[in-house]
Amino acid sequence: KYITDQILVMYLGNMMEYGDTDEIFDNPLHPYTKALFSAVPVPNPDAKMERIILSGDIPSPANPPKGCKFHTRCKECMSVCKMLEPKYIEHTKNHFVACHLYNEEVMNNLAKYDEELKREEHEAAVKKALEEEMLKDKNWFQKWMIKRKK
């Protein structure tokens, strides 16, 4: 806090939050920034700090997830987070955050993203089921060709 004028918080090589040091410390917006700050030890043993414990899968930097890179560990995760990478929003002067929670356009269209995610999940489940069937039956292609000829 006393070393720099500005802070940039990154996760898997992506900017999550950026701004003036005092603003970020006083008003962290991104769930990852909040979790980081909650892990900072406080020298006062009487001070009660609420720790944010991150759970969920830590994604591979070589194969990051679709959408927000933090969604696999975020307690605020919504369907849109799994689909779209968030835009950088200037929440207040010189305080930028990449989180759908602060994007009015996205927040006003959550139902659309919920439906789209359900459709994508259904399609993925059907594809997985077909692949499992094909693995069970090594002769699936021959059977498919015979059925097709009939």
What spans do the regions from the language model cover?
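Charged, flexible cofactor/metal-binding loops and thiol motifs
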Residues: 21-123
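Long, low-complexity, intrinsically disordered cytosolic termini of multi-pass membrane proteins
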Residues: 122-150
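Intrinsic disorder/low-complexity signal
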Residues: 16, 103-104, 136
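A short, surface-exposed alpha-helical micro-motif characterized by mixed small hydrophobic
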Residues: 1-2
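Catalytic metal- and UDP-sugar-binding loop of GT-A-like glycosyltransferases, i.e.
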Residues: 10
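Short, glycine/charged-rich "phosphate-handling" switch motifs in NTP-dependent
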Residues: 6, 18-19
